[in-house]
Amino acid sequence: MQIFVKTLTGKTITLEVESSDTIDNVKSKIQDKEGIPPDQQRLIFAGKQLEDGRTLSDYNIQKESTLHLVLRLRGGIIEPSLKALASKYNCEKQICRKCYARLPPRATNCRKRKCGHSSQIRPKKALKK
C-alpha cells in the first residue's frame, strides 16, 4: 500500500509499505529517500507520536494515509570546556554589597556611582549543584 509522509518544509514523500511493517521499517525507508537518520525522526499520525516497535496496523494506518515527520529536538549536555569557560566569566566575580554590581575578580572598589564607589565588596557565591 502507499502512504504519504509530510515534512515540516511542506514536502510530501510517497512510500510503498505493508500494514505489517514496523515504524522502524518506515523510518529506514525515509532515511533511504531523505537521508535523515531514524533516531532523529519523529512520526506523527492522528496527533500521536508513533513508537518504533509497533506496526502500521496497530495505529490503524491505511492506504493513502498521511504521516507527519518532525525532527527530534536538539539539546542537552554542555561540553566541559565550554562549561569551564562560562564559569570563568560568570562565577569568578566580586559583588558590591551596596548595589549588587558584578565586578572583576581583582576589583577593590565598585565601579558604579550610585553606591559611591563603595569598597564593600564580596566574592560571588558559588552555584549550588
From Swiss-Prot:
- Report keywords, A-Z: Cytoplasm, Isopeptide bond, Nucleus, Ribonucleoprotein, Ribosomal protein, Ubl conjugation
| UniProt-listed Pfam families | Ribosomal_L40e, ubiquitin
**BP-aspect Gene Ontology terms:** modification-dependent protein catabolic process; protein ubiquitination; translation
Question: Where in the chain is the Glycyl lysine isopeptide (Lys-Gly) (interchain with G-Cter in ubiquitin) cross-link?
Answer: 6, 11, 27, 29, 33, 48, 63
Classification via Gene3D superfamilies: 4.10.1060.50, Phosphatidylinositol 3-kinase Catalytic Subunit, Chain A, domain 1
**Record-annotated Ubiquitin-like domain positions:** 1-76
Q: Name one GO molecular function term.
A: ubiquitin protein ligase binding
Name the InterPro entries for this protein: Ribosomal_eL40_dom, Ribosomal_eL40_sf, Ubiquitin-like_dom, Ubiquitin-like_domsf, Ubiquitin_CS, Ubiquitin_dom, Ubiquitin_ubiquitin-like
Disulfide bond annotation, renumbered to this chain: none
Covalent cross-link Glycyl lysine isopeptide (Gly-Lys) (interchain with K-? in acceptor proteins) as placed by the record, residue numbers? 76
This entry carries the following GO cellular component terms, namely: cytoplasm; nucleus; ribonucleoprotein complex; ribosome
Is Cytoplasm among the key words of this record?
yes
The similarity comment for this entry is: In the N-terminal section; belongs to the ubiquitin family.
What name goes with this protein? Ubiquitin-ribosomal protein eL40 fusion protein
UniProt organism field: Cryptococcus neoformans var. neoformans serotype D (strain JEC21 / ATCC MYA-565) (Filobasidiella neoformans)
